[in-house]
């Protein structure tokens, strides 16, 4: 279950503050939200996430991108809930809301989730192999991942 946290000052336009996959999740409660955009996706099992007073099931390859400071909590619904995740920062972090049409929550369906999971795995593998030395590569991959969320801004009807 690899997990990486940024260990250098932010100098790139977009950067992962943290990224990981194959993470065994028990649950988290964030009444003040998280300080950065936070993406959470189920790799296997099933979880339950509460955002803005609404409860959703998070099944395999489904995910949520949550804006900073949005209260939320999540917990496992199955015996084992395994996740991929990424949190985003960077010198252009303030431009992310405009990229996402100021949406505070974006639902990711299974098809898009498969692509995002593959991108997260590529980034995790790259960090494992080469560390965080190539900030341009990581920044480019971070931006590429953020672009996936712009494709999902209008999301399914139950999220409108």
Locations of the language-model features?
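Ligand-binding loop in jelly-roll beta-barrel domains
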Residues: 55, 68-92
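Active-site/binding-pocket entry motifs
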Residues: 22-25, 90-94, 151
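An amphipathic alpha-helical interaction segment
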Residues: 91, 111-160
